[in-house]
């Protein structure tokens, strides 16, 4: 069976849409219901707009109606986007505000602004984290790649902790480890004076962190290896330091400024995560 079920203005179909069911070859086994924008212009976009879009508490754009079970999952976060259609637990959804799951299976984006592009068994549980996995050993997130972007501002020789949201470090904004995990991290830090400035500060580190049960167990395994250290001009005293945060259970990236200047700092923490 194939054919047009409705066109704009007829059979209850909104103007500007063509809805067609295709069940002939090659769609005999899995039929396709096509919704096509029909505009008077040469090309036409198709927008799916949740109620409240453009506000802080806008609705989510989702592939299924939540049912609080593993079938369709829990309610999604405000302004979230979730195209994942298969899971084995109700929590495997984009439940964080502004979180995104592009597809795949058994993924969870629970942190605010967190992203899982696809794949299988990835968990992005902290602020702005990107996670990717191709499967897991026993539970989602126990074999994955993660990336978190941190930032902060120093004025003069002050010190500041770089965090994902630019505020004080917490249990969700400082490249936090999951319980029972080891993170092998590559940390790249850069800073400059905003505007047309020649000031350049770059540091690159590698380090291994372990967290058992509870934030207080977070620790460095071995030392921190400094791979790159660039400061231009040479008389800058700006520097970055890496340590374990046993209060919030994460990776602490601390920036120290240089006299007489304001520096904007950015940092990527890339982590190979296993548990």
How should each PLM-predicted stretch be described?
Residues 29-42, 91, 138-183, 190-202, ...:
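Surface-exposed ligand/attachment interfaces on beta-rich extracellular proteins
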Residues 261-269:
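Edge beta-strands of jelly-roll/beta-sandwich modules across compartments, strongly enriched
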Residues 29-49, 55-75, 79-94, 98, ...:
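Parallel beta-helix/beta-solenoid repeats that form elongated, surface-exposed shafts/blades used
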Residues 57-173:
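Periodic small-residue-enriched repeat registers in elongated scaffold domains
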Residues 1-58, 66, 216-226, 235-242:
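Surface-exposed, low-helix, low-complexity loop/repeat segments of extracellular attachment proteins
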Residues 269-275:
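Short beta-strand-to-coil "C-cap" segments at the C-terminal boundary of structured domains/repeats
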């Amino acid at each position: 069976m194939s054919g047009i079920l409705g066109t704009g203005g007829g059979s209850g179909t909104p103007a500007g849409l063509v809805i067609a069911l295709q069940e002939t070859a090659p769609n005999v086994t899995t039929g396709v219901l096509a919704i096509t924008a029909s505009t008077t212009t040469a090309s036409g976009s198709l927008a799916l707009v949740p109620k409240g879009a453009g506000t802080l508490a806008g609705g989510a754009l989702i592939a299924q109606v939540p049912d609080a079970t593993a079938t369709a999952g829990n309610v999604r976060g405000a302004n979230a986007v979730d195209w994942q259609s298969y899971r084995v637990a109700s929590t495997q959804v984009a439940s964080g505000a502004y979180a995104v799951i592009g597809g795949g299976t058994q993924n969870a984006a629970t942190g605010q602004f967190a992203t899982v592009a696809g794949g299988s068994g990835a968990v992005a549980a902290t602020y702005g984290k990107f996670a990717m996995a191709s499967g897991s050993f026993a539970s989602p997130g126990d074999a994955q790649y993660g990336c978190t972007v941190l930032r902060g501002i120093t004025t003069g020789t002050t010190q500041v902790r770089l965090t994902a949201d630019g505020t004080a470090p917490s249990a969700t904004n400082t490249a936090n480890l999951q319980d029972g995990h080891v993170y092998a991290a590559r940390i790249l830090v850069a800073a400059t004076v905003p505007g047309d400035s020649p000031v350049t500060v770059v540091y690159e580190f590698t380090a291994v962190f372990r967290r058992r049960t509870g934030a207080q167990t977070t620790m460095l395994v071995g030392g921190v290896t400094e791979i790159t250290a660039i400061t231009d001009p040479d008389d800058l005293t700006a520097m970055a330091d890496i340590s374990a945060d046993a209060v919030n259970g994460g990776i602490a990236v601390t920036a120290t400024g240089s006299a007489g200047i304001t520096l904007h700092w950015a940092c990527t923490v890339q982590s190979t995560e296993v548990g």
